[in-house]
């Protein structure tokens, strides 16, 4: 058994040698579309499976068969001693686990420090567990989906239902002695993009508007703290408080996960003890032909969907 990372990297170019596998020079799409998609005209990073023509137009992995470019380097072999272990224990090595590990590593939470997580989907859930594993003393998680809040609380997260409070920032400051969290992770993902409709949804507290969530993250971090962004931003964000970041000396780290960089850290934890609870993340399992249903219930947050696993 092998696990295929979501980004495609060669393993030998300049950026791969720097362990920045999501920036692989060999697989980067240098076409006009990728260049046009960059506000700075610098194009995009490494090709990604199933991520449109902007990232290489490589077909995605939700299929019966998958062609794997750069297969000499990318696929991660499941250890032979893990024979008989369920696929789900290793499945998340393709994206969820390394993305979460990188988010926590970039957050640079002090020993026994406090981490805030905005968005308790799969990345937020796993980030909380990894943060505790790596020595965080306290994790505060923000969302409004009951099933997400319940699952996070099971793993020791102090949860905040943003639909039930007037001002998340003020509550987080109150919970942290007025200073704010040592670090925050924006794991909201591509749920909103700051449009008028999204703003209305945020105003009515139906969902967490992405730009608003980012500002709440920043406003809830202590001076000298760190913001780690794992939620994907496809373009400019309105009202980005750069001046406040400068004044508060908040460091910002972000980017697509460099999957292979973190595999050696994660693999020893995928044992029968399952300290990260990888087998507890899946809420739905369905055949491949039901993928549209899986996407729908996840996008609409129906039927308690947190993570849907498709089986061919």
Enumerate the language-model features and the residues they cover.
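Adenosine-nucleotide cofactor-binding segment
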Residues: 117-120, 125, 132-216
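Glycine-rich helix-loop-beta junction characteristic of Rossmann-like nucleotide cofactor-binding loops
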Residues: 105-110, 176-177, 219
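Generic structural signal for buried aliphatic residues
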Residues: 1-3, 115, 227
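Glycine-rich Rossmann-fold phosphate-binding loop(s) that bind the pyrophosphate
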Residues: 96, 119-123, 232
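C-terminal hydrophobic helical "lid"/dimerization subdomain
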Residues: 165, 179, 260-312
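Conserved "cap/hinge" positions at secondary-structure junctions
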Residues: 3-6, 231
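Glycine-rich phosphate-binding loop and adjacent beta-alpha segment
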Residues: 136, 188-274, 312
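NAD(P)H dinucleotide-binding glycine-rich loop of Rossmann-like/cofactor-binding domains
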Residues: 10-118
